[in-house]
Amino acid sequence: MNIKISEITKELELVGEGGFFGVKDKYGTDEREGVKKLLFKYENRYEKLNAERARVRFLQEYELSYPDYRYICGIDEVGRGPLAGPVIACAVILPKDCEILYINDSKQLSEKKREALYDEIMEKAISVGIGSASHARIEEINILQATYEAMRGAINKLGVVPELLLNDAVTIPKVVIPQVPIIKGDAKSISIAAASIVAKVTRDRLMVEYDTVFPGYGFASNKGYGSADHIKALKELGPSPIHRASFIKNLTSC
């Protein structure tokens, strides 16, 4: 008598990835279409999982290429382009053997995935530092210098002193720690990718809060970026206290 497919499913769940091929060998000669589909589904799942692990190992190559350094810090920012709100920078130090599946440049991830990864990063990281520069500070010293200031602030808030900085494309002035700028680093380094996610989630949450304080501009959805609805509201309502004057000077006469 053939074992029920539901029982095979339970067995597959019980043994997990490590025992899959044993179960596959056990039922590989079963001619039932349902069994074939079940085994294919699980094998495909584990193949995708292994491919993801390989992708994450590739993201670890920069960190692993500096074996003499224990504390390697990835740095990234978010918020250089919006019409309103601060620029936020994040510095993240991960353990050398840290595996965070599905981590990527924050721009490539859904909000739901970013939120889940944020929690995992905060749990696994050796240290996380977050820095910011307000809309007023951006106006005072310009967006580039404000970004550098936010990055320095993030470094200073780390619980340990990093030995090496991996930066997304930039070299940060007034920092004595060795730096390695990496073009499109948030897609090439696990530490920078982690920093991009934490910075993005932090700023997005802040803009959602601002939406309740300054309603009408749609900050909860546009996060301060220049969407059509945001620009329309800006023209109708005038600027809020967190708008960047130099960024909106061509959009409003206020």
Curated annotation (Swiss-Prot):
GO terms for biological process: DNA replication, removal of RNA primer; mismatch repair. Its EC number is 3.1.26.4. Manganese or magnesium. Binds 1 divalent metal ion per monomer in the absence of substrate. May bind a second metal ion after substrate binding. PROSITE patterns: RNASE_H_2 (PS51975). It catalyses: Endonucleolytic cleavage to 5'-phosphomonoester. A divalent metal cation binds at residues 76-77, 168. It comes from the Bacteria. GO terms for cellular component: cytoplasm; ribonuclease H2 complex. It is found in: Cytoplasm. InterPro entries: RNase_HII, RNase_HII/HIII, RNase_HII/HIII_dom, RNaseH-like_sf, RNaseH_sf. Residues 70-254 form the RNase H type-2 domain. This is Ribonuclease HII. It comes from Lachnoclostridium phytofermentans (strain ATCC 700394 / DSM 18823 / ISDg) (Clostridium phytofermentans).
